[in-house]
């Protein structure tokens, strides 16, 4: 990864690689879905994958709102807060507001240190056939605050064309949750998700790539006595930055593979081990607008799930914005 360079007014249109460096300085961790209770989890494809999601490498604050839309279904039997349900259909839209701050001082051999927090607001409509009611369809719609994401550790080391990252998102059960209700905006358990990654950026060509590996560790849902298994997740991306108008466009692709590595457990895990997975690939489009010493970035991605087991299968639509100040 090239050495840090701050965006300037009149940035030369023939230097797209500078924008790769800028992207690394404008990123943050994402907030809060795999098998387990409800066929979902706190982590989801698209959260930490592209250059805009990398930990910051320059001091200052950042604001990062996001919009996430998901539509999925599952013909398999799924454990939920309303009991065992088949033929689930879910439609969720989430607005996430958050941001953080990066310190000027470095630690641990030159690591840039940042903290961040994100709070989602979700509208969810869900339906399915209840096993306890003999297959009768049940449904509900709910909206409200979701589970808060705290990121007390965001570390980034830069060395030439490479950046090495360590981040530790913590998902707190602050969202609305009721047993007996099919849909909830919160999951009612904690998740700690340590992640390590590496990113490459070529300052001459504008080519960038990133890969991040994490392990989501879940606690038990005290209301249902259900402990969702831990999830190993890999997110990768490749992007190319090109001059466009007064700024720069980036185009690329993102791929992921999430695998549950431990069984669901607890008195409420009536379906047994119930390990799940999801994998897919989708396009990523973005635009970077330099504004003197600041910059504004937009990113859109469509992430269809191509292979799933014991969970909902559908499509994620992400719209992210990052403003560095």
Annotate each predicted stretch with a short phrase.
Residues 44, 61-71, 115-121, 166-172, ...:
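Transmembrane beta-barrel strands of outer-membrane/channel proteins
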Residues 50, 81-87, 134-140, 178-184, ...:
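Extracellular loop and loop/strand-boundary signature of outer-membrane beta-barrel proteins
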Residues 36-38, 52-60, 72, 103-113, ...:
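Short loop/turn motifs that connect adjacent beta-strands in outer-membrane beta-barrel proteins
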Residues 1-44:
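Cleavable N-terminal export/targeting peptides
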Residues 65, 97-103, 150-156, 168, ...:
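Residues on the lipid-exposed face of transmembrane beta-strands in outer-membrane beta-barrel proteins
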Residues 37-42, 70-94, 130-141, 182:
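Surface-exposed strand-loop-strand hairpins of Gram-negative outer-membrane beta-barrel proteins
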Residues 39, 76, 83, 223-325:
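Outer membrane beta-barrel transmembrane domains
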Residues 89-97, 111, 142-149, 186-192, ...:
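Residues that define the transmembrane beta-barrel architecture of outer-membrane proteins
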């Amino acid at each position: 990864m090239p050495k840090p360079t701050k965006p300037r007014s009149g940035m030369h249109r023939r230097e797209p690689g500078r924008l790769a460096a800028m992207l690394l300085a404008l990123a943050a961790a994402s907030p809060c879905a795999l098998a387990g209770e409800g066929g979902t989890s706190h982590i989801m494809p698209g959260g930490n994958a592209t250059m805009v999601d990398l930990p910051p490498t320059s001091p200052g604050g950042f604001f990062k709102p996001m919009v996430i839309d998901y539509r999925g279904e599952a013909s398999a039997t799924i454990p939920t807060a309303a009991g065992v349900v088949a033929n689930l259909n879910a439609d969720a839209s989430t607005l996430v507001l958050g941001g953080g701050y990066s310190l000027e001082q470095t630690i641990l051999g030159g690591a840039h240190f940042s903290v961040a927090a994100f709070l989602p607001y979700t509208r969810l409509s869900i339906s399915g056939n209840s096993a306890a009611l003999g297959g009768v369809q049940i449904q509900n719609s709910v909206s409200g605050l979701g589970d808060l994401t705290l990121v007390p550790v965001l570390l980034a080391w830069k060395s030439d064309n490479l950046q090495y990252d360590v981040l530790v998102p913590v998902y707190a059960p602050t969202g609305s949750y009721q047993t007996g209700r099919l849909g909830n905006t919160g999951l009612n358990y904690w998740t700690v998700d340590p992640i390590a990654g590496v990113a490459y950026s070529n300052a001459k060509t504008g080519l960038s790539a990133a890969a991040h590996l994490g392990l989501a560790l879940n606690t038990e849902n005290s209301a249902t006595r259900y402990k969702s298994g831990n999830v190993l997740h890999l997110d990768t991306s490749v992007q190319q930055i090109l001059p466009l108008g007064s700024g720069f466009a980036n185009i690329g692709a993102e791929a992921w593979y999430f695998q549950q590595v431990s069984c669901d457990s607890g008195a409420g895990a009536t379906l047994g081990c119930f390990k799940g997975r999801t994998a897919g690939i989708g396009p990523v489009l973005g635009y970077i607008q330099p504004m003197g010493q600041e910059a504004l970035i937009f990113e859109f991605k469509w992430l269809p799930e191509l292979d799933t087991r014991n969970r909902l299968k559908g499509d994620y639509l992400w719209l992210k914005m990052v403003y560095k100040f």
